[in-house]
């Protein structure tokens, strides 16, 4: 009985450690079931995207900040440094920081909404605001520099006080270009968000567009830039880091990022870079 009370008052990472220490059980993260994507096989375009939505929606949702398992806890597992697991790897810079330094009055790390939370104005509400598939640890200053910029090629390198980050920004187009090592990661997270949130059950309908809006302050549920993201997806293919991260998130949220498991799904839905101008999701923002 005391075991039950004790476990209920632990967070998930602590529960994993508890079972390992007490019972010698090694908990492995869930792998993709053989039939997970079977309903999407043989489809393309909107039909495939809708089928994938049916597969990955209804996931387990966690709070942004809570005394129970929250986004902070999950990110410490998904993005931990494999050399020093007490640290997390900061997404845009590639630097590491003590995982326990959650924000820490601005001197630690924060949570980056890769699909900017103002693009749809969903904030940190459960669902798009707490979906770990599109959240990454980030240096506080770098997070502020990225702001809610669109994803596109930049011109001016963003130099942090600790040194170069490999990221670029463009003030004229309000765009952000991440370092080469995570360009594909960004693309696949953005594609996940459009696929997961299609406007059902009162949720937002997130859409990736291929034009930079004139109004950078718009809170419409859109993000750019599709043709650039397709290029990044191709040039920076899925690696073992992303695959492992997908597995860890699956063990919590019970859904996966299809574009990590099957990168070919991207072209099946959005086409290639050369065909993107004809894609039906482009919309008139005027």
Where is each model-derived feature located?
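Residue-level detector of functionally pivotal "anchor" positions at catalytic/ligand-binding pockets or at interdomain
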Residues: 272-286
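Short, surface-exposed beta-strand/loop "edge" segments at domain boundaries and coil↔beta transitions
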Residues: 97-101
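N-terminal module-boundary/linker segments of secreted carbohydrate-active enzymes
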Residues: 30-96, 268-269
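Domain-level detector of nuclease and nuclease-like folds
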Residues: 103-273
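Short clusters of hydrophobic/aromatic residues that line enzyme substrate/ligand-binding pockets
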Residues: 91, 259, 276
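Short, charged, low-hydrophobicity "junction" segments
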Residues: 27, 61, 162-166
């Amino acid at each position: 009985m005391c075991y039950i009370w004790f476990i209920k008052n632990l967070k998930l990472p602590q529960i994993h450690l508890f079972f390992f220490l007490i019972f010698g059980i090694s908990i492995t993260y869930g792998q993709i079931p053989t039939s997970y994507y079977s309903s999407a096989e043989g489809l393309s375009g909107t039909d495939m995207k809708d089928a994938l939505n049916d597969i990955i929606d209804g996931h387990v949702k966690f709070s942004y900040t809570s005394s129970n398992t929250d986004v902070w806890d999950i990110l410490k597992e998904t993005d931990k440094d494999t050399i020093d697991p007490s640290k997390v790897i900061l997404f845009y810079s590639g630097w590491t920081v003590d995982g326990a330094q959650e924000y820490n009055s601005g001197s630690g790390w924060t949570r980056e909404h890769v699909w900017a939370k103002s693009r749809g104005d969903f904030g940190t509400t459960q669902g798009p605001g707490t979906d770990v598939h599109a959240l990454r640890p980030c240096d506080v200053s770098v997070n502020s520099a990225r702001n809610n910029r669109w994803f596109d090629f930049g011109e001016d390198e963003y130099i942090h006080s600790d040194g170069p980050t490999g990221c670029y920004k463009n003030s004229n187009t309000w765009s952000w270009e991440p370092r080469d090592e995570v360009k594909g990661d960004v693309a696949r997270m953005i594609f996940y968000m459009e696929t997961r949130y299609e406007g059902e059950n009162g949720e937002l309908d997130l859409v990736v567009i291929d034009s930079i809006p004139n109004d950078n302050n718009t809170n419409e549920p859109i993000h750019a830039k599709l043709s650039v993201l397709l290029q990044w997806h191709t040039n920076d293919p899925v690696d073992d880091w992303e695959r492992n991260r997908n597995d860890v998130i699956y063990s919590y949220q019970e859904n996966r990022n299809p574009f990590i498991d099957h990168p070919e799904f991207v072209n099946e839905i959005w086409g290639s870079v050369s065909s993107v101008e004809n894609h039906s999701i482009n919309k008139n923002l005027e």
